[in-house]
């Protein structure tokens, strides 16, 4: 019999908890470790629609990238989306597990999958590196190479590969050869990408001043969207869980889509 604890332990082999940022919240955030599991729903976010989908499908567990609980909670009521999500899970005996920044950093995680989806070659982790008191070292960003091409061509690749609704970008005035990637909000690592010899950086949630900084520094900076840059890992995560636990059903959420549209 497979339990929540079994799947949690496996997820933590894929994305060790020591790789999470200090401010993050990962692991089992709702439910019971002892609950038997026959169905797992995998999604990027544990939003209300995903929780309802899990309940309707009869899942005992949802596994997501983003955490069910991130900001401190003072109450759990139906007056908030987080409260409704938690209450839906509790009513139906569904547990919630997530791997967030630990999955961003982990080998084969968010940023390795993003690099592979964009067709980058010779992919490697670049600084900044993190190290714990046991001497273990890891990093967040990835760097890879593409055949030299104009920015316009690479933009087409990014948009089509990630099924992005649209892209925001600045042209740094250079062809694309060496690309850094950071799924989700990694734009504060612009200088890290530049110092690593990258001419192009693909990330999300880029601020106004960061676009100006990139242009001044001669960096092609591409905002492909938070959902689009991180969602590719969902299919990979679901596939790995299904392979590790062949006796259970694993499904990718059919209701969770990017809510952002471009007019």
Predicted regions and their residues:
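Hydrophobic structural segments
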Residues: 1-263
């Amino acid at each position: 019999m497979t339990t929540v604890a079994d799947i949690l332990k496996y997820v933590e082999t894929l994305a060790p908890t020591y790789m999470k940022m200090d401010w993050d919240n990962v692991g089992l955030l709702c439910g019971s470790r002892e609950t038997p599991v026959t169905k797992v729903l995998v999604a990027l976010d544990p939003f209300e629609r995903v929780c309802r989908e899990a309940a309707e499908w009869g899942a005992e567990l949802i596994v997501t990238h983003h955490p069910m609980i991130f900001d401190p909670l003072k109450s759990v009521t139906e007056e908030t989306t987080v409260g409704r999500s938690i209450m839906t899970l509790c009513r139906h005996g569904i547990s919630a597990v997530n791997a967030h920044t630990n999955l961003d950093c982990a080998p084969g995680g968010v940023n390795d999958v993003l690099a592979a989806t964009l067709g980058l070659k010779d992919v490697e982790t670049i600084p900044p590196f993190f190290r714990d008191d046991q001497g273990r070292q890891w990093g967040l960003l990835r760097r890879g190479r593409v055949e030299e091409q104009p920015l316009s061509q690479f933009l087409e690749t990014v948009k089509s590969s990630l099924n992005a609704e649209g892209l925001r970008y600045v042209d740094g005035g250079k062809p694309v050869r060496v690309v850094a990637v950071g799924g989700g909000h990694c734009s504060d690592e612009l200088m890290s990408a530049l110092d690593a010899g990258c001419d192009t950086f693909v990330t999300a949630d880029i601020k106004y001043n960061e676009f100006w900084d990139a242009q001044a520094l001669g960096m092609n900076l591409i905002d492909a969207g938070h959902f689009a840059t991180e969602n590719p890992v969902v299919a990979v995560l679901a596939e790995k869980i299904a392979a590790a636990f062949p006796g259970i059903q694993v499904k990718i959420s059919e209701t969770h889509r990017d809510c952002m549209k471009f007019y």
